[in-house]
Amino acid sequence: MKAPLRRGLAALCALLAPAGCQAAPELAVVGDSVKVKEGADLPRRSALYAGGRVRLRAARGETLGVQVLLTHAVRGAIALDLHAKDVHIVAFRLDTVPVREPSTSMYGDSRGPGQYPDVLTPAPGGIEGQPRAYFDVAVGPAASPGRHTGELRIGSRRIPVELRIENARIDLRSDPLVWVYYMPGEVAAVHGLPDDDRPEQIEVEREYYELFRRHGALLAPHLGPHRFPPRRQFMKDVRFWPAWVDHSSDANIAADVRRWLELLDGSDVRAFSIPIDEPRTAEQRERVRHVAEVIGKAGGGRPSFLRAVTDAVHPVYGDSIDLYFSPLNIPEPANERRARGQLFWTYNGKPPHAGSMIIDTYGVALRTWGWIGYLYDVDLWYAWEGLYFRDRYNRGAEATDLLNDPVSFDERQKGGTDFGNGDGLLAYPGALPSLRLKALRRGLQDRLLLEQLEDCGQAAYARRVARALIPRALGEATGERAWPVHEAPWEEARHLVLDGIERHCPP
């Protein structure tokens, strides 16, 4: 192992150790994978702020998230400025939501009740009189590498800022790792529109689509072929697209498959269809197999129209399934079966397999997805859902008051026991991003940096850094989560990757 990497891994290991006893600070400047409940102590360690100076480091094409956290509301404005061309800063008001009941163990461990920061509202007029603020620092692909200076203003206080732009370059919008499912009717309802695919509805959906693409995710519905044409415009720079088929009869299955094949003829995009979600009984699995076989007879199947199931490999499926969504399949039997042409992806997350989507967990939770996706060669990660504004599975037509009660999925309404805060919700009505969506973006950008390092012939370097941070996940993981819950080790690992790119990858 080369000396720079060895020293870097030693520093990373030191950061994984518990912090010593220090007084809680009155100011913290942290990244987008930190989540501090209202009234809780601010982080004693920061990867961005030390010695009275904020230090930022970014690749070209990368967006950094910067949170400014105070123990009390400041008099005056909180503002961030940088003197650099092709660097754009967007300020957000960061508001909390009240978690009164901790999410159940179906989602992993909860950090308990409290006011959690999550709702981000653009603040073009500035942020006044608040105890917290959030900034996106977007470094353009043509930004000049080197050191650039700026200033963080907190009321009358001035803190110097340094931004180091690297030669590395990423493109977050192209070939997204994460597919985020949504129902067009949910978006239409919250905006007072009919669910009829008129231009007004598509334009509103585009706002949400663009929000997610800016964060490295594909927001796409799982609709039948008759509703695809108005949304074809969203199928850009992707390798895969969800394609629903009507499985109420064999004739309808075959008709939809043939229509999809016509619609996608001449495209490099591969369709995939999940006719039955999360089959649990023998009868449901038999039905999955039957639908898959009918799809195959109609001309579907790998490589162009993938028959998918959100389940682990099971003998009943035989060779009828082309694509499995389950963390339990990875790395095995995925590695053995990929030679047959089968694909193995994953969905959602729960420790120790992957971080959870819920509000009341650690800020790094969704950052794990990008790193895990890299380590285990996942082509697509399915997030159910992203815009679950109404708990239609449990409450029917009743809208969820998300800002006052973030329990978005509640099986107690129909006799169950599980419920989750923010489950299926990565953005709020009005196309407002959540802090969790920012953490997801952070991990997806980390993945692109790891891939760039690997493309420069440094796969062993990149994987050593990633394995030091996440020793095990997905189907390899049992017991407790294996990754750190604080941001500093993640940023140290990211810096090691950037160091490797600077040393080994030509500009």
Feature roles, as predicted:
Residues 186-200, 242-252, 272-285, 322-327, ...:
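The substrate-binding groove and active-site-proximal loops of carbohydrate-active enzymes
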Residues 318-408:
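Catalytic-core region of carbohydrate-active enzymes that cleave or remodel glycosidic bonds
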Residues 1-9:
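Bacterial N-terminal signal peptides that target proteins for export
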Residues 212-213, 228-239, 256-269, 295-301, ...:
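Acidic (Asp/Glu)-rich catalytic clusters
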Residues 8-19:
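Bacterial N-terminal signal peptides
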